[in-house]
């Protein structure tokens, strides 16, 4: 796709203070955002975004910046489809009028991302919407929020960006054909989150591989691989049957969270129990069961056993998404046949993974 610029070119434009267009996967939001490093924002840049892109002007920031400003999350129960972490909206405490003009919004952003910014420098609510990026960036969550922080951080800039969705004249979201025309008209480069994931994956990993050894289970022998999460310090396991090959399908079960409740099989939201998944994969030529550890509090443990949970769809934890993908990529798994109900797994392209089908558990 010649209209897609390689990540080094995208990085160069970001470092030069230019805007770029960043797209996500077609099976995710399937949108393109204007994006620039926040420290270079100007009233003219904001005006261009609101005039030509027409979306919501947001301010992706890393967690430390959000905490330094004392910004609470917009809601304690995030029900957004893709888990975007909105904080409360903000305004510069001084130097603005209504807060909505391009100049006022630019000043608010400049104030918030200043290295000397303090909580008293901003007020809430306002006309700028900060977004808290996941630690680990696009290797953890394949979103525009994380891409914005990554692209700034990789250039040694302040870890914050300004983004705005691109909307067509008729109010619909701009897809790739329209984005290509937009880029050509305004002389902007287009980059993809998938390419950014692939670029970072070549030189970075969020996991430390602690080694592997055979392990006997009631369902037969597996090769146990142990990984330590560099961000959380938690330990994740992969139980591998056979030798996964890149050109053949591999049965995959990603079990998350893996906790004491699995030993008594008190997990009605998982269509495949851990024993059932291990038994099924042991009968296949190759397969992988990933056990992602995440500390659970008492409330979440009880919630697993409540009757109301039985009919609720299991919501994938975005913080674990990239971890599972990195484990699979490292095991040479490319084509996944997932043990579970059909669902959308976004952002896998950058890890070189493809879901070819699903297998639901028998009732």
UniProtKB/Swiss-Prot annotation:
Enzyme class: lyase
Positions of the record's site feature: Essential for catalytic activity: 127, 165
Keyword Ribosomal protein listed: no
GO molecular function: 3,4-dihydroxy-2-butanone-4-phosphate synthase activity; GTP cyclohydrolase II activity; magnesium ion binding; manganese ion binding
Entry GO CC: cytosol
Start and end residues of each stretch annotated as DHBP synthase: 1-202
Pfam family, one: DHBP_synthase
Gene Ontology terms: biological process: riboflavin biosynthetic process
EC number: 4.1.99.12
Coiled-coil stretches: none
Entry keyword set: Lyase, Magnesium, Manganese, Metal-binding, Riboflavin biosynthesis
Binding locations of Mg(2+) 2: 29, 144
Cofactor(s) needed: Mg(2+); Mn(2+)
Binding-site positions, Mg(2+) 1: 29
Catalysed reactions, as listed in the record: D-ribulose 5-phosphate = (2S)-2-hydroxy-3-oxobutyl phosphate + formate + H(+)
Span list, region GTP cyclohydrolase II-like: 205-363
InterPro entries: DHBP_synth_RibB-like_a/b_dom (IPR017945), DHBP_synthase_RibB (IPR000422), GTP_cyclohydro_II (IPR032677), RibA-like_sf (IPR036144)
Positions with a binding annotation for D-ribulose 5-phosphate: 28-29, 33, 141-145, 165
Cofactor binding note of this UniProt entry: Binds 2 divalent metal cations per subunit. Magnesium or manganese.
PANTHER family the record matches: 3,4-DIHYDROXY-2-BUTANONE 4-PHOSPHATE SYNTHASE, GTP CYCLOHYDROLASE II-RELATED
Free-text function comment from the UniProt entry: Catalyzes the conversion of D-ribulose 5-phosphate to formate and 3,4-dihydroxy-2-butanone 4-phosphate.
Listed NCBIfam families: PRK14019.1, ribB
Family membership: In the N-terminal section; belongs to the DHBP synthase family.
Protein's name in the database: 3,4-dihydroxy-2-butanone 4-phosphate synthase
Higher taxonomy: Bacteria, Pseudomonadati, Pseudomonadota, Betaproteobacteria, Neisseriales
């Amino acid at each position: 796709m010649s209209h897609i610029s390689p990540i080094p070119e995208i990085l160069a434009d970001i470092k030069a203070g230019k805007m770029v267009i960043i797209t996500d996967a077609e099976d995710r939001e399937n949108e393109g955002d204007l994006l620039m490093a926040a420290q270079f924002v100007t009233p003219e840049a904001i005006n261009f975004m609101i005039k030509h892109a027409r979306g919501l002007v947001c301010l992706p920031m890393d967690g430390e910046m959000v905490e330094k400003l004392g910004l609470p999350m917009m809601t304690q129960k995030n029900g957004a489809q893709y888990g975007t972490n909105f904080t409360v909206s903000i305004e510069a405490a001084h130097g603005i009028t209504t807060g909505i003009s391009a100049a006022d919004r630019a000043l608010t952003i400049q104030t918030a991302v200043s290295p000397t910014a303090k909580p008293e420098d901003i007020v809430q609510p306002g006309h700028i919407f900060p977004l808290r990026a996941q630690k680990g960036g696009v290797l953890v969550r394949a979103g525009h929020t994380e891409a914005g922080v990554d692209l700034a951080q990789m250039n040694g800039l302040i870890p914050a960006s300004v983004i705005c969705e691109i909307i067509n004249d008729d109010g619909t979201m701009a897809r790739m054909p329209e984005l290509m025309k937009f880029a050509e008209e305004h002389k902007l480069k287009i980059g993809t989150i998938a390419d950014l994931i692939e670029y970072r994956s070549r030189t970075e990993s969020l996991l430390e591989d602690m080694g592997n050894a055979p392990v006997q289970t009631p369902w037969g022998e597996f090769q146990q691989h142990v990984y330590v999460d560099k961000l959380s310090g938690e330990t994740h396991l992969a139980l591998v049957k056979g030798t996964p090959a890149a050109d053949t399908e591999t049965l995959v079960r990603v079990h998350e969270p893996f906790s004491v409740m699995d030993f008594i099989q008190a997990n009605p939201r998982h269509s495949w129990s851990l024993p059932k998944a291990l038994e099924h994969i042991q009968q296949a030529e190759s397969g992988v069961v990933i056990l992602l550890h995440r500390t659970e509090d008492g409330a979440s443990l009880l919630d697993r056993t409540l009757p109301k949970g039985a009919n609720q769809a299991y919501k994938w934890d975005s913080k674990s998404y990239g971890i599972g993908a990195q484990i699979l990529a490292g095991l040479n798994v490319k084509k996944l046949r997932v043990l579970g109900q059909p669902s959308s797994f976004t952002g896998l392209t950058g890890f070189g993974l493809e879901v070819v089908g699903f297998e639901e558990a028998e009732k």
